[in-house]
Amino acid sequence: MSSSSLVTSLLFSSSSSSNTATSTSSRRSFSLFSKNQYCKPSPLRRSSSLLLVRCSLQQQQEEKAAPAAESHHAGGGQDDAATASHHAVEGENGVADADGGGVKKSKEELEEEEQQEVDWRSDEEFKRFMGNPSIEGAIKLEKKRADRKLRELDREPDANPLAGLLRGLARGQLAREKERLELAENTFKALDLNKLKSCFGYDTFFAVDVRRFGDGGIFIGNLRKPVEEVRPKLEKKIAEAAGTDVTLWFMEEKNDDITKQVCMVQPKAEIDLQLEITKLSTPWGYLSAVALAVTTFGTIAIMSGFFLKPGATFDDYVSDVLPLFAGFLSILGVSEIATRLTAARYGVKLSPSFLVPSNWTGCLGVMNNYESLLPNKKALFDIPVARAASAYLTSVALAVSAFVSDGSLNGGKNALFVRPEFFYNNPLLSFVQAVIGPYADELGNVLPNAVEGVGVPVDPLAFAGLLGIVVTSLNLLPCGRLEGGRIAQALFGRGAAAVLSFATSVALGAGAIIGGSVLCLAWGLFATFVRGGEEIPAQDEITPLGSERYAWGLVLAVVCLLTLFPNGGGTYSSDFLGAPFFRGGI
């Protein structure tokens, strides 16, 4: 893991080079504070250096307007004012005049200087900030710009009463902003790394090198005891030395095929601020969750109606569709409870649950964000596995209970007639077909008791189990912050997880373009852009997961692939899949 990946994981504002920074990207860096009213970005105006240049040039012009005799007489000894003016120009702009006299700037040169003042890339404070992004540096930049704007407003004349009133309002707003910045400056202070060095030792984490990272630092060394023993002891020592609470991460950093253990230290106030900004447990977040839940229930109800036989009445809808609806909600409910219980066991806070409505399967799963730090890789692995495993088990339990209650595989009295495309070209279901036979024809092209032009009779609860398996497998794809992406990050690290995420996005795109699958297109876009990225690092990424969790990961991967990957041979005849069967496609 390189240090650049750490910057991406833990800081909102970062840049690879000051030469590529723009005013737009700078404003993004400072939006970190706006939610808590610590600062608001204001445009950079002309600085005092430009005013000094203008003043110096004005003095030079006045000296040239003096009598020629006095000007020639000054050859033996220059006027003190001219000398001071020349030094001011030289100090502000780095221009050296060999004769010691004033040099009149052209209009183009002045415009260029003004543009440099407006351009944030010429700001030295900004350059230092981009070299090491930190909240303290951002506050200093905003405070400097607020002071500059206040001075600029104070110099403007109040000839127009209305303009004076507006300037007064702006001045008051800037003054309040400056007060907030001063308050934030007292809260967010960069840690003194020299003081922190003495906190590391042979009995905790032996540090051999340190480098600045944000307002904290990265200590390179090696761990001497298990993380669960070292972290509380070291956090207490560092907090006492720094005078503020801190948060620690223990990670492995790879450079030039050499793996080193590192301990990253950051002020706790800054991490709390970052978590506060991304928190979805707000009134708007809960309102959005309710709106998505209502929409998802509607799509499940609409999708369920597609499987009724022609000429079905409302009573048929109630008797046939409600079991499917209840089965789907059972899968979602059980998996949600398992997820939250597992997260609570590790002390991880979860955001509200956001259902993903779908016109194909009714629902494409549930989204949750982590609203607190993950203590270790076990938490990063166990929480998504709890959701996936519970959803799989509930789906299978529903299907088995439906078959047992019906006493057959025909769907019973209230069977849904499911389009065969839900079973087509899938290795897992093809295997099920081979086991449960007999087939309806000699060629083995259809499921038992299938009715051509109507579909395959399936019990509603059994079909809910099938949909639950498919939706769970979609969420197990190793892409972004889907459950599968989180599992991949826990098992293989962020670097390998990023490669798997990219490969999965490409595969989904290929399925959409080559195979013409709308589901691949929609899910690929959702997984890449809505749930893309990676989770914030766990505080302990050094302690290994153990072979048992790798085995569980392999089992889930096999089930996911068997459920989603097509098999080349197929199971159905082209006539059975063609018109006039379809009443709506996937």
UniProtKB/Swiss-Prot annotation:
Annotated Basic and acidic residues bias: 62-73
Keyword Protein biosynthesis: no
EC number(s) given by UniProt: 3.4.24.-
Transit peptide region: 1-54
Superkingdom of source: Eukaryota
Signal peptide per UniProt: none
Entry GO CC: chloroplast membrane
The keyword Aminoacyl-tRNA synthetase is assigned to this record: no
TM ranges: 287-307, 318-338, 389-409, 427-447, 454-474, 506-526, 550-570
Xref: InterPro entries: EGY1-like (IPR044838)
Cellular compartments annotated: Plastid, Chloroplast membrane
Keywords attached to this entry: Chloroplast, Coiled coil, Hydrolase, Membrane, Metalloprotease, Plastid, Protease, Transit peptide, Transmembrane, Transmembrane helix
Membrane topology annotation: Multi-pass membrane protein
Main location: plastid
GO molecular function (one): metallopeptidase activity
Region Disordered, residue ranges: 62-118
Known role: Probable membrane-associated metalloprotease that may be involved in chloroplast development.
Sequence similarity: Belongs to the peptidase M50B family.
Name the UniProt record assigns to this protein: Probable zinc metalloprotease EGY3, chloroplastic
Originating species: Oryza sativa subsp. indica (Rice)
Taxonomic path: Eukaryota, Viridiplantae, Streptophyta, Embryophyta, Tracheophyta
Gene behind the chain: EGY3
